[in-house]
Amino acid sequence: MDHSRSIPNDTASEADYAQLRALFESSSFTLQAICRRFNISKLAEVDPLRNRLSDFGVPTTAADGLIQLFVEGKPIEPGLFTSLAGLEAISLLERLNLIYSLNETSIAATVALYPIEHVYIASDRYNSADGSQFEGFDDIVYPCLFETSARFIRILPRASCGPVLDLCSGTGVAALLMARSSEHTYAADITERCRRFALFNQSMNGIYNSSVVIGDLYQPVAGLTFDRIVVHPPYQPVFRHQQIFNSGGLDGEQITRRCVEESYAHLRPGGRLYCLAQITAREQPVDQRVRQWLAGKGAADCDIGFYITKRHEIELFAAKATLTTKGNELDFREWLRAFARMGVRSLDYGLLIVERHAAPREPFNVCLKTPDAWDPADLEASFAFEIECRSAGFESRLWGRKPRLTPTAKLEVEHGIGPGGWQLSHYRIIQSGPFDVKIQASQGLAQLLALFDGTRTVERCFQELTESGAGVGRRPFVDTVVAMASEGFLRW
């Protein structure tokens, strides 16, 4: 029997799910145990294709046995597993359709299963139990222990809120993680296989303020509105459909665009869409293109922030896509022609935030480049500052703030040869976090930024600058402080 398309039992008794949770807890089947076994620092460093060929030794604890089955994806001898995990473990896992008899001497897992923060998640396997070549399939439920999913999990907002929609939910991991701080969560995906896995994960974790729905994007939640919508859509540009979890059409935007276009109708006032995706920059940058997507659908009532983590040049992407699909030079050239026809200049990967206004005001766009190891808190702070600096009374509040220059800021002074020797050419201020920014600066701006050490108020800095004879006006000074804060040079 082919177990590659097995689905865990999502209609088992609550007693069985509770017993499974107890097994994991008593076995210390935790992130720390996985990291110790693989000698890694985080789950996203697991490389299953390599690890299943490695020998991590005979399991000596129940946690090791569970890790071998569900994370390494290797078979284990039933007697050994029973001695580690207890007499009832095998029958429990069989009832839940999580294991099967591979042969007379070993059992194997039907799924991958692992801890993600405070929940356990089951997904489709990513390797074959018998060591044969692993073949994926169209509606495979993508594992969420790889780096791409880890990035999405990091950006999930955790503040208390009303209902949440996890769109393109796959395993339903976002809905389960956010259920702890949300009134209710909904996991929505288009495939029956994802629905079944999400239902199992919900029951396995004993989380009941969450619902699983099936349909095309927002269709199964028609008429509902949310405080938060989170989505990690299929965004891979493809010539032809590959797998549902990654195929985003020729430009990679077909699903992402619809997620954004239809979001306004499902966001409550003050609600936000968080979308981790790859969007193409064309004649207009990504943030302006996103506003065009919302034209006639709430564009004037939304703020847009796009924080770019990676920028892929089209030639490099075309080469990688050709190699990945085992194509040839003709495929490479066809990719370049396709991007040229669409006017694509680069493929920008990052976090898109769209907020529906809670009250009427002017909308804004912000687009910044972040380091690869970005902190979601910096992105949230950036977006919050853009909102605050457009609020009533902001300028009076600004004068009492004590900004501090970001520790990553550097001042470069360039000289050029001229009459009489070296002459000052210009100043350049650069930073590598929280955003990658480089600006030309005057001596006055360099002097101003040096005043922001976290001990002086903005008002005091203005006074000192005025006393130094800089001759800067109040309005230009405020505008400069706001601009430097927007670029991430200042922290409060």
What spans do the regions from the language model cover?
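SAM-dependent Rossmann-like transferase core, predominantly class I methyltransferases
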Residues: Y100-V164, S169-L177, S181
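Acidic, low-complexity/disordered tracts enriched in E/D and polar residues
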Residues: D2-G65, E104, A129-G131, A359-A450, ...
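Flexible, glycine-/basic-rich loop-and-beta segments that form/coincide
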Residues: E313-E386
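Conserved SAM/SAH cofactor-binding pocket of Class I
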Residues: F146-V231, P237, T280
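Long, charge-rich, low-complexity alpha-helical segments
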Residues: A62-T110, A150-P157, G162-L167, V354, ...
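Mobile active-site "lid"/loop adjacent to the S-adenosyl-L-methionine
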Residues: E192-R193, V231-C259
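Conserved Class I SAM-dependent methyltransferase catalytic core
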Residues: G252-Y307
